[in-house]
């Protein structure tokens, strides 16, 4: 699940130039009047994961954008890795923030940015401006054309490609100006807790933790139950389940893991039931026990790692 969710951070030529991230989100943007609830949940989750990152951060929300700004020095890689574990984020953009002044000042900042990031490289590029603050004296298309021309003059090794450029230099003009060109992929999905809580039947295989990850990605908090049957299942097997739960919890938030001693039930079924039906009867009782725990803990659904047509073990 982890490798599926979080792509490696792309190379940034000079990480020290970045003190902030613009956070892009996907599905939340199509919500209606309650969109702010999902945005607030996402902001809270971002704040929570950044508590474990070296450095101090301020997370703000502004007109369809979420910004993470570092106050002083911080661990860049650690911050990116933490944000890549937050469901609801589709993109993490390292940004340079400058004060909103005139066009000449903006041009100077953009030239410095391109020099640091792509100086000497044969790249195709385009400039994309979003002028949210209409008080800026030039329109978006005008800014794109003028900055594109200046980049060509300053960096003759670069060429324009407005259809499939190697680099898109984004400029967002708001209360301040945000400059960025890299978009680090996030896991997507919905913010945790926006769709209730469910109980995961967790085993030592790969299917159930992946199922838990996929449901958590839809905004569902996860609890888990594991059926332990010593001496037929070892302590090592139980520890493997605990380790898997920790891996899922890196994305889903804290997981309450319920460990059920299943030995007596398993032996009773073995003694009393037809042996060709043992597997399905044991699974039936696992479902019943998981359902009872789910009802007692406020979980609204059960999650399993089963596939249609799969042979049970």
How should each PLM-predicted stretch be described?
Residues 205:
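Conserved G/P- and acidic residue-centered "switch" motifs that form tight phosphate/ATP-binding loops
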Residues 13-199, 209-255, 264:
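RNA-binding accessory domains that recognize and position tRNA/RNA substrates
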Residues 1-2:
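Short linear segments in intrinsically disordered or otherwise low-structure-confidence regions
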């Amino acid at each position: 699940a982890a490798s599926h969710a979080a792509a490696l951070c792309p190379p940034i030529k000079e990480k020290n130039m970045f003190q902030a991230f613009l956070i892009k989100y996907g599905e939340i943007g199509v919500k209606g009047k309650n969109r702010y609830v999902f945005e607030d949940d996402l902001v809270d989750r971002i704040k929570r994961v950044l508590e474990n990152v070296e450095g101090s951060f301020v997370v703000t929300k502004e007109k369809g954008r979420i910004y993470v700004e570092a106050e002083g020095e911080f661990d860049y890689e650690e911050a990116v890795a933490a944000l890549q574990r937050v469901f609801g984020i589709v993109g993490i953009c390292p940004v340079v923030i400058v004060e909103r002044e005139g066009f000449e000042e903006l041009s100077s900042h953009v030239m410095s940015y391109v020099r640091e990031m792509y100086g000497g490289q044969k790249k195709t590029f385009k400039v994309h401006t979003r002028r949210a603050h209409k008080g800026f004296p030039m329109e978006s298309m005008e800014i794109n054309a003028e900055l594109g021309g200046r980049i060509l003059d300053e960096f003759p090794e670069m060429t324009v490609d407005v259809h499939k450029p190697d680099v898109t230099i984004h400029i967002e003009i708001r209360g301040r100006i945000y400059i960025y060109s890299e978009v680090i992929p996030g896991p997507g999905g919905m913010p945790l807790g926006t769709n209730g809580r469910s109980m995961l039947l967790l085993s030592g295989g790969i299917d159930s933790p992946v199922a838990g990850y996929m449901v958590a990605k839809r905004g569902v908090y996860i609890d888990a139950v594991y059926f332990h049957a010593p001496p037929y299942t070892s302590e090592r097997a139980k520890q493997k389940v605990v380790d898997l739960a920790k891996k899922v919890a890196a994305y889903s938030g804290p997981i309450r893991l319920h460990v059920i001693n299943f030995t007596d039930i398993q032996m009773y079924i073995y003694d009393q039931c037809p042996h060709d039906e043992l597997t399905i009867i044991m699974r039936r009782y696992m479902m019943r026990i998981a359902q009872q725990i789910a009802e007692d803990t406020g979980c609204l659904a059960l999650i399993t790692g089963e596939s249609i047509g799969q042979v049970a073990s």
